[in-house]
Amino acid sequence: MNKPVHNNEHRRKRFNKKCPFVSAGWKTIDYKDTETLKKFITERGKILPRRITGVSSRFQGTLTLAIKRARHIGLLPFVAED
């Protein structure tokens, strides 16, 4: 009978994340820039999703490709180093 009018406890505030590559004016992502690529990889070696990083869909694809290229060449590890 006594239901709360608004249950805001479980709602999260949404805000638009700006793509770091668009705001910095990047045209492409270089696979040799390992310091930038490491920011978008977890400590386990997984690529972070767009909803966490805020990267646009265009740059998420190029970022994924750059990370995979860097892994195949040996610039980035495939898995975490224990």
Curated annotation (Swiss-Prot):
GO biological process: translation
Pfam families membership: Ribosomal_S18
Subunit structure: Part of the 30S ribosomal subunit. Forms a tight heterodimer with protein bS6.
GO CC field: cytosolic small ribosomal subunit
Disulfide bonds: none
Family to which the UniProt record says this protein belongs: Belongs to the bacterial ribosomal protein bS18 family.
The species this protein was found in: Chlamydia caviae (strain ATCC VR-813 / DSM 19441 / 03DC25 / GPIC) (Chlamydophila caviae)
Gene behind this protein: rpsR
Protein name (record): Small ribosomal subunit protein bS18
GO MF annotations, alphabetized: small ribosomal subunit rRNA binding; structural constituent of ribosome
SUPFAM superfamilies in the cross-refs: Ribosomal protein S18
Database matches in InterPro entries: Ribosomal_bS18, Ribosomal_bS18_CS, Ribosomal_bS18_sf
HAMAP family: Ribosomal_bS18 (MF_00270)
UniProtKB keywords: Ribonucleoprotein, Ribosomal protein, RNA-binding, rRNA-binding
Cited function: Binds as a heterodimer with protein bS6 to the central domain of the 16S rRNA, where it helps stabilize the platform of the 30S subunit.
PROSITE patterns linked: RIBOSOMAL_S18
